Amino acid sequence: MTKKEKIIVIVGPTAVGKTALGIQVAQAFNGEIISGDSQQVYCHLDIGTAKASQEEQESAVHHLIDIRDVTQNYSAFDFVQDALEAIKDILSRGKIPIIVGGTGLYIQSLLEGYHLGGNLDQSALLAYRQELESLSDEALLDLMAEKNISLKEWTRRRAIRAIELDRFGKDLQNQEFPYEFMLIGLNDDRSYIYERINQRVDQMLEMGLIEEAKWLYEHYPQVQASRGIGYKELFPYFEGEISLEEASQNLKQNTRRFAKRQLTWFRNRMDVTFYPISEESYPIRIINDIKIFLENKAQDD
């Protein structure tokens, strides 16, 4: 039997320090970073997407950053294809792929083998998945019986995946993820995360977020990229509807809500091992745990 090669995945809500940790891990284990963020794919949108700085990108190779023009759409289907290609390339050069990001749908779609067909609207899949996850175990079993779906080993996650496959058919190709992965999450008390978010928004505004958002507003106000948090909150300010202070507060509030949704996703839908970032030694703990993971015998395919 062939052995599965290993990769590292770092997730968590916005503003917890995923980028910095990813660089530390890349430097410690001869790795390269694959961005798992739906907004960082866009050229010219650097501040509002919290993209790794030029200096940070020089300290560790980054993939899937600046690969789309702001006029182009990007989906979970695109990410899965691009990420698999990047992983294969990185491993072929004897390095460790490190996926770093907070877009739960993208990460889950990759790791759980959801290869979305081109005809499938990912919002339809997401809505159906949320509907299924609201059901009790008994209701899921009833639905499986109704659809004549059977599983050798029943878990909620496998049941939901099987029902989705039944619903969407060929547009949701179910393929096992071909690599063994360690899934690391960064988190802490909500108040601590929210404080970091507020500080980050202030820093972004000081770094030139207003000018970046104004460029997007003036040139491409209707594109997918303009709907991202960090930009849409400033559009009413440009239109004279609210003050800059109000826009700033809206941005902080929306970012906090987004972080809460991110955490809910990772906690409820993925098997993440979380590390509290308020502990000064957390990067050392993570690096030690990664070392153990990488040194263990690779899993049989």
UniProtKB/Swiss-Prot annotation:
Record-listed substrate binding positions: 14-19
Interaction with substrate tRNA: annotated segments: 37-40
Residues that coordinate or bind ATP: 12-19
Enzyme class per UniProt: transferase
EC numbers, comma separated: 2.5.1.75
Annotated catalysed reactions: adenosine(37) in tRNA + dimethylallyl diphosphate = N(6)-dimethylallyladenosine(37) in tRNA + diphosphate
Keyword Magnesium: yes
GO process annotations (BP): tRNA modification
Keyword match Heme: no
Cofactor: Mg(2+)
UniProt-recorded Gene Ontology molecular function terms: ATP binding; tRNA dimethylallyltransferase activity
Keywords: ATP-binding, Magnesium, Nucleotide-binding, Transferase, tRNA processing
Pfam families, per the entry: IPPT
InterPro entries in UniProt: Dimethylallyltransferase, IPT, P-loop_NTPase
Disulphide-bonded residues: none
Site feature location: Interaction with substrate tRNA: 103, 129
Family according to the record: Belongs to the IPP transferase family.
Quaternary assembly: Monomer.
HAMAP family xref list: IPP_trans
Functional note: Catalyzes the transfer of a dimethylallyl group onto the adenine at position 37 in tRNAs that read codons beginning with uridine, leading to the formation of N6-(dimethylallyl)adenosine (i(6)A).
Protein name: tRNA dimethylallyltransferase
